[in-house]
Design a protein with these regions (language model features):
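Active-site core of metal-dependent hydrolases
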Residues: 160-286
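Charged helix-capping and loop-helix junction motifs
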Residues: 75-78, 112, 155-157, 232-237
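His/Asp/Glu-enriched, well-ordered alpha-helical/loop segment
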Residues: 235-250, 254, 266-278, 283-368
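Conserved, mostly hydrophobic/aromatic
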Residues: 86, 133, 189, 219, ...
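Metal-associated gating/positioning segment near the N- to mid-region
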Residues: 49-108
Length: 388
């Protein structure tokens, strides 16, 4: 039986369509029309999101865990639990994100993730569409909670071991541009189809620009774990804000970055280069307590995830990030939606698969109200009740 979605509007990733009718068959979008084109089929399962806007499901390029599980567990239970939780918050696709750990442990996690990522998408669950390596090529000074003893110097040989363990599923890698050999590794990763993001870094502007010339395309959680802005040495942060070609992530939870700085970032990057991420860890969707991020313990209380007095990821979800962003900046809905759909898809080179609504695509859509609040979603062809 067909599933039919109706709503006030559809934002398909490029344009707004009034009174849309989206037909879904066998988990894919079969047609897109409007109510003006005729009556709805009588035999269909009709989901009416009156007053809401349909849009592509969200894409989180930086998430470590959720609902008590960490991506580096690399088990069907861990990824399945994460994926179900993410779907209930409007996320249809995500990059399973690692943290710095002993190299052998990272290789084992990547091998396990590779097997899971090769499985077909599960209806009603967000799809892990790739891997984001956050570490081990990070700055000691700006490592955050990532363990110093496992950080490594940039090395094409080490990268190749990681890439091959993941069976080519690595889509994004964070690297500190000031480390010796960083530009060469950025170029090497690019040659293997991996996008690189500058972050966890004390880099100068010149060092950051060298990484960008080598192919770096993104900045990891802007403002966090970065050399502070200085009017004589803009550093990695000033470069991230002013380089027109560079995408820039934001953890928009009101904890990692003040609303005023979110507004500054938005004015600098605009609707073409800004990306919302969660950087969520295993405590997302769970009560306060102690949880794991990779191999170390994190204390969570009142929405803050802390380890050793340092923020250690978040408990944010992308639906909350969207609403926060609109409240902090006053951005219109169709611009705000780009930050969770079109932009992350473009940055990762996955625009041919995700980030837009089109006939033939996997049916993963959200319905949001005018304030950006999630009211429902369909993920991999199956309707999912929005979590509150």
């Amino acid at each position: 039986m067909q599933t039919i979605l109706t709503a006030e509007r559809l934002w398909d990733g490029a344009r707004l369509i009034d009174h849309p009718v989206v037909a879904i068959e066998d988990g894919r979008i079969a047609s897109i029309s409007t109510r003006m084109a005729g009556d709805l089929p009588g035999a269909a399962n009709i989901l009416d999101f009156s007053g809401a806007t349909l849009a592509p499901a969200f894409f989180d390029v930086h998430i470590h865990g959720a609902k008590g599980h960490d991506a580096m567990e690399a088990t069907p239970e861990a990824l399945g639990t994460m994926s179900s939780f993410l779907a209930s918050h409007g996320t249809g696709n995500f990059l399973a994100t690692t943290v710095t750990a002993p190299l052998d442990a990272t290789l084992r996690a990547l091998a396990g993730l590779a097997k899971l990522l090769a499985e077909p998408p599960v209806p009603g669950q967000a799809r892990p569409i790739g891997i984001h390596l956050e570490g081990p090529f990070l700055s000691h000074a700006k490592r955050g909670v990532q363990p110093a003893e496992y950080l490594l110097a940039p090395s094409t040989a080490t990268f190749d071991r990681l890439f091959e363990a993941a069976e080519g599923h690595v889509r994004l890698m964070t690297i500190a541009p000031e480390l010796p050999g960083a530009p060469e590794l950025v170029a090497h990763a690019r040659s293997r189809g991996v996008r690189t993001s500058v972050g966890h870094s004390m880099a100068t502007a010149a060092e950051t620009q060298a990484a960008i010339r080598a192919g770096a395309i993104n900045a990891t959680h802007t403002f966090n774990a970065m050399r502070p802005l200085d009017h004589r040495e803009p550093g990695i942060l000033g470069t991230a804000l002013t380089c027109d070609s560079l995408y820039a992530e934001m953890i928009c939870d009101g904890i990692h970055t003040a609303p005023e700085m979110v507004k500054l970032w938005w004015r600098a990057k605009g609707p073409e280069r800004a990306i919302l991420v969660t950087d969520a860890m295993s405590a997302a969707g769970m009560p306060d307590g102690e949880y794991m991020l990779g191999g170390f313990a994190v204390q969570v209380a009142g929405g803050r995830a802390m380890a050793g007095g340092v923020l250690a990821g978040s408990v944010l979800t992308l639906d909350r990030a969207l609403k926060n962003f609109m409240e902090f900046t006053g951005a219109p809905l169709e611009q705000a939606l780009r930050l969770l759909t079109v932009n992350p898809a473009s940055m990762t080179g996955l625009s041919d698969q995700v980030g837009s609504v089109a006939v033939g695509r996997v049916a993963s859509l959200v319905a949001v109200d005018a304030a950006g609040k999630l009211v429902g979603s369909v993920v991999n062809g199956l309707a999912v009740t929005a979590s509150r």
